[in-house]
Amino acid sequence: MVTVRAPATSANLGSGFDVFGAALTRPADVVTVEKAAETTIEVTGVGAQYIPEDPKKNTVGAVVEALDAPARIHIDKGVRPASGLGSSAASAAGAAVALNRLYDRGLSRSELVPIAAEGEAVVSGVAHSDNVAPSILGGFTVTTSEGTHAVDASIPLVVCLPDVAVSTRDARRVVPETASMDDLVETVGNAATLAIGMCRSDPDLVGAGMSDPVVTPERARLITGYDEVRAAAFDAGATGVTVSGAGPAILAVCRDGQRRGVAAAMLDAFSDAGIDSRAYQTRIGRGSTVLEE
């Protein structure tokens, strides 16, 4: 038996659509696997009632097939589905790391990223790695057609999750198919600034580099109260605010000592909009961790 803790993640980070990702210290899924002749999946925890246990419809089932590793699998969900925090990716990442150890497949963490991404395709329709990469590798990740690169970073964050759902498929439908040259230049410059900030663990640079004039404004329209929550976070000292992944979670970058105030401001802003929400005071952290074997 192998048990793995797989962290929630935030993808895109504003200017890095389908490229950037970051592992969060909380929340997380816990995945336990045992060898079996036939694969079965049991899901408990947050939003378990919305997650199929049929291996053909669960992200974990695709990972099992790719590794040829049938198992009894238990997923204790700490990452709510349809949250913008890489819920399906956390399960797929945890299963990939756990099954690799259980069956002694000998694959590196980097080699597990595309395998876990196949699981993501079950949910979103596309095998993207921007969530599974940080959930497996940890830190800040950059994923392109050439592969994934990761760097350790220490950036304080607040994630505010409203009690509404935005599906990845719906969020992809609103993404513009074209962008102006001015918007392209602005986005590239911001993405480069963010990447430098991550390498330096500089929350001011990271926050300054999150602005995105193309994708984020369209996705923000799907989140009631987004503009007010964003403004409240900045007023409380956040250096950058954006939609986390497909949403509805909102990510705020903070300096040390400011997370509590930023979290309270974001919660109050959602409350003023008539929406319940939960705030996680977190930071960029480790990837999937083996807890027991």
UniProtKB/Swiss-Prot annotation:
Annotated localization: Cytoplasm
Residues the entry annotates as binding ATP: 80-90
GO CC field: cytoplasm
Covalent S-S links between cysteines: none
Gene3D superfamilies xrefs: 3.30.230.10, GHMP kinase, C-terminal domain
MF term (GO), any: ATP binding
The keyword Transferase appears for this protein: yes
Main location: cytoplasm
Family under the similarity heading: Belongs to the GHMP kinase family. Homoserine kinase subfamily.
The protein, known as: Homoserine kinase
Organism: Halorubrum lacusprofundi (strain ATCC 49239 / DSM 5036 / JCM 8891 / ACAM 34)
Lineage of the organism: Archaea, Methanobacteriati, Methanobacteriota, Stenosarchaea group, Halobacteria
